[in-house]
Amino acid sequence: AATVANNGKRVAPHLVEGIYANNDQGGLGDLIEKKETKELNQVNISEEDMALIKQGFYQVVNGWSGLTTGRTIAQGAMVSISAKTGTAETFVNGGTSAINTNVVSYAPSDRPKIAVAVVFPHNTDLSSTVSHSITRDIINLYNQQHPMN
């Protein structure tokens, strides 16, 4: 999702933009150490193809067809989210299957600031949208701390 949000630029995943001290009230204080973004490479893709991929990510959450598998991500979202959902079935010893549901996303859709990936391993209820809720809640929480509108 981050590569799509960055128009094909692959960056190393990171959790924080910096390390901060606390202020007198226990809130966010001064920046102690900034974590730089490390660019890995650029994917060789045309602008037209990248635009199609971005439109696909947007439609997964915001479209109205029967293929709009991530519509519940938008319910209660504070900003526009683009995402791709997925399901992977694996088999462990003895032939027992395990189903993992996944969401990769970025927000806001038009000016991405955050990319989020959620994996829900061994999901026994494929009608569950818990990975969608987790995705939306992470993005909403980030937006509360770092307004993206």
Where would I find each of the regions flagged by the language model?
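A structural-propensity feature for long, helix-poor, extended segments
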Residues: E39, E47-E48
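Active-site beta-strand/loop architecture of penicillin-binding DD-peptidases
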Residues: A1-E39, F57, V61-N149
